[in-house]
Amino acid sequence: MATEEIKYQPKDYKSDQYVRWCPGCGDHAVLNCLHKAMAEVGVAPHNMAVISGIGCSSRLPYYMNTYGFHTIHGRGAAIATGVKTARPDLSVWLITGDGDCLAIGGNHFIHAVRRNIDLNIVLFNNKIYGLTKGQYSPTSDRGFVSKSSPYGTVEDPFIPAELALGARGNFFARAIDVDLKNTTEILAASARHKGASVTEVLVNCVIFNNGIHKQITDKEFRADRTIFLRHGEKMIYGANNDKGIVLDGLKLKSVTIGQDGYTLDDVLVHDAHCKDNTLHLMLAMMGGDMPVALGIIRDVEAPTYDEAVHEQLKEVQEKICLLYTSDAADDLIGV
């Protein structure tokens, strides 16, 4: 008798816990997107584990009707690595913030990415330490004034994309908290990707860093300051879809289609599956006079650490078993 496939709804992933984030915090939106993405992918709640470190975003496991572990500061990636290696059948998610992930947890993060462990890493980036009440973080811009930098920071920030791709990451995406549709789409793609996926979500902290991303998230000028990349599609953006990205020598350039001799044919087509990450890194680093790249920037398949470990264990166990068969024992002693 055939069993009917269960159709999960977003509510199936919601726990009964009161959500304790501040009203207006961007984390609320990301949580809702994750509920919707999981329902879309169809991962059973009992086949999902959500791991986190310490920080505002790291409270998320409490709000998921799944297995979860609220661990210690910066160590979420290490715990998630162990969970996935021990239970490769689970969909394992790492929820982390810019401080938790890139400061005390930086080493665990880059090695989880380098090893290509099949983890879904969601990096909430609000460029501030919110839980400890407003200190600058590893992603805060140079000159940023905070409680721990009253005269402005004198250091340059980490750029999560540069770090993830530099660690040989095979999946990197960027989303914004106010774009629920596309953020849900990205998280669903992250869940389907086999290997380490890193999704940076630009979130707003209404209390300690309000409006930090408004130059690209406000609807008034979002279309002209961001470009949403889709594999196989032209890199076009703008309120009138009249701007595009072209290659000018060894650099990317934003042009207006129909001006200065540029046509639609000159505009680059996004190839998220290209194994060479050179162009992906260039796209991920855009900003300033160039639009900030959103969407799935890189999505490449590669062998995963967790599968390789289990394949190696199986191979070694089979060899050990052979030692205890009579034929193998005879061969071993030369009979």
Show which residues each predicted segment covers:
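Electrostatically charged, flexible surface regions
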Residues: 194, 203-310, 314-315
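Glycine-rich beta-alpha junction loops
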Residues: 54-56, 126-128, 179, 202-207, ...
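Active-site diphosphate/adenylate-binding microenvironment
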Residues: 7, 11-72
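Short coil/turn connectors at secondary-structure junctions
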Residues: 17, 44-48, 86-92, 114-120, ...
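Thiamine diphosphate
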Residues: 54-130, 182-184
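Conserved thiamine diphosphate
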Residues: 9, 89, 137-192
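Conserved small/polar residues in nucleotide/adenosyl-binding loops
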Residues: 324-329
